[in-house]
Swiss-Prot record:
Coiled coil: none annotated. Residues 1-22 form the signal peptide. Gene3D superfamilies: Fimbrial-type adhesion domain. Its main location: other. Belongs to the fimbrial protein family. The operon is cryptic under classical laboratory conditions, but is functional when constitutively expressed. The gene is yadC. This is Uncharacterized fimbrial-like protein YadC. GO terms for biological process: cell adhesion; cell adhesion involved in single-species biofilm formation; DNA damage response; response to antibiotic. It is found in: Fimbrium. It comes from Escherichia coli (strain K12). InterPro entries: Adhesion_dom_fimbrial, Adhesion_dom_fimbrial_sf, Adhesion_dom_sf, Bact_Fimbrial_Adh_Pro, Fimbrial-like_YadC. Induction: Repressed by H-NS. Keywords: Fimbrium, Signal. Part of the yadCKLM-htrE-yadVN fimbrial operon. Could contribute to adhesion to various surfaces in specific environmental niches.
């Protein structure tokens, strides 16, 4: 009778206990299982915005398919902020299977440097997406090696999580010892680098908006497909999307320009007072600069002069826009561009498309084509002088003088 009792007692003790597996499996999904062992109830969906303020992507005009040097970085993205959680399980059914990366990015049919290029919303503009430094809370690490994984390159992309924190293993994952019990570790933290490529189809309009094209409502996702029998029934997705709502495209440009010089007041160059004799004998030129600032990827600079009023006899002069008995007559203003490494001293003829003042920016900006979020632009002064001249043979009559003009600066 004593032997039978021990046998029955052994069975009773055995039937009340679950076996902790030698393996730890991982699944992902929403945050419904945080603090209750239930695991995710459905998928998690989140959208990360690049910036909350205006930003510009600046590209050169392409001559062939190739990289632009423009990259956008998202660092320490945490799916936990959008309710996407990584869970562990150590039941007897646990299988240490991988996490699969899937994507809904739109393949362009083009490749460069061994990587697939994916479409954006702008024709001729493509991108690659690199995921790197993937981890979770409690120093839960992955086997992803540097530089990371280019999402979408091969059809099957997987990586493995592993627990390095002994407390997480013994006080967390090991308590999830049945197929329907899960310990919530935290969000999947990772870095994303988007690099842009262009070809000759790229011809953006001014301030054109761009988005990364997708065939669904996400760009990439995480899911465990083989965490173990019955464990897999609780496995869901984490879907990740990006918006570039505050990002605009532009070709090389300077975002700010101001008029500077000792005779400058706001947007006005004050010429001073002159006698008719001084004007006839040659008035002193008044120097001024157009200071181009926050210049991104600028090299060549071309300036043209446009006005609504030129001289009566000498059309190279800016004419007086004032009329009436108090207006000066017989004079105009000559605008000259000072000598540069690209251009000798020259007269900038108003309304003449062939009269172009040329300068060149030698300094490199530090923005990598993303402004103002990544680094600083350069500054470049354009040097000019304005001289009051007699308008042909028209008699000079004293009075007030005002000329207006627009300097059209482009970056070919």
């Amino acid at each position: 009778m004593k032997t039978i009792f021990r046998y029955i007692l052994f069975l009773a003790l055995y039937s009340c206990c679950n076996t902790v597996s030698a393996y730890t499996s991982f699944i992902v999904g929403n945050n419904a299982g945080v603090d209750n062992y239930r695991g995710p109830s459905t998928a998690a969906q989140m959208t990360f915005n690049y910036t909350s303020t205006a930003s510009n992507l600046v590209f050169y005009k392409p001559t062939q398919l190739g990289p632009t040097g423009v990259k956008m970085y998202w660092s320490y993205l945490d799916t936990g902020t959008g309710g996407g959680i990584l869970y562990c399980n150590t039941s007897g059914r646990a299988n240490p299977g991988p996490i699969t990366i899937e994507n809904a990015m739109v393949y362009s049919g083009k490749d460069y440097g061994g990587h697939k290029l994916f479409n954006t919303s702008v024709p001729g503009l493509y991108y690659t997406m690199l995921i790197s430094r993937v981890w979770s809370a409690y120093d839960t690490i992955t086997d992803i090696q540097s530089p990371g994984i280019y999402i979408g390159d091969p059809s099957n992309q997987e990586f493995f999580f592993s627990v390095t924190d002994s407390d997480l293993q013994t006080k967390g994952c090991n308590k999830a010892d049945d197929y329907d019990k899960f310990w919530a570790i935290g969000g999947i933290v990772h870095n994303i680098t988007v690099e842009f490529y262009t070809d000759t189809n790229f011809d953006p309009t001014l301030n054109q908006q761009v988005q990364l094209s997708s065939s669904s409502n996400y760009l990439y996702s995480f899911k465990a497909y083989s965490p173990g029998t019955k464990v897999v029934d609780h496995s869901n997705h984490i879907y990740v999307n990006f918006t570039l709502n505050n990002v605009k495209l532009t070709l090389p440009t300077c975002f700010t320009s101001i008029l500077t010089g000792p005779s400058v007041n706001g947007s006005t160059v004050r010429m001073g007072e002159y006698s008719s004799g001084t004007i006839k004998n040659g008035a002193s030129p008044v120097p001024f600069d157009i200071s181009l600032q926050n210049c991104i990827r600028v090299r060549n600079i071309e300036t043209k002069l446009v006005t609504g009023k030129v001289g009566t006899q000498n059309t190279q002069l800016l004419g007086n826009t004032l009329t009436g008995s108090t207006a000066a007559k017989g004079v105009g203003v000559l605008i000259e561009g000072l000598a540069t490494s690209k251009n000798p001293l020259m007269t900038l003829k108003p309304n003449d498309t062939n009269s172009v003042y040329i300068d060149y920016e030698t300094e490199d900006d530090t923005s990598d084509g993303v402004y103002p979020n990544q680094g600083n632009g350069t500054s470049q002064p354009l040097h000019f002088q304005a001289t009051l001249k007699q308008d042909g043979n028209i008699a000079i009559e004293p009075g007030e003088f005002k000329a207006t003009s627009t300097f059209q600066v482009t970056y070919p």
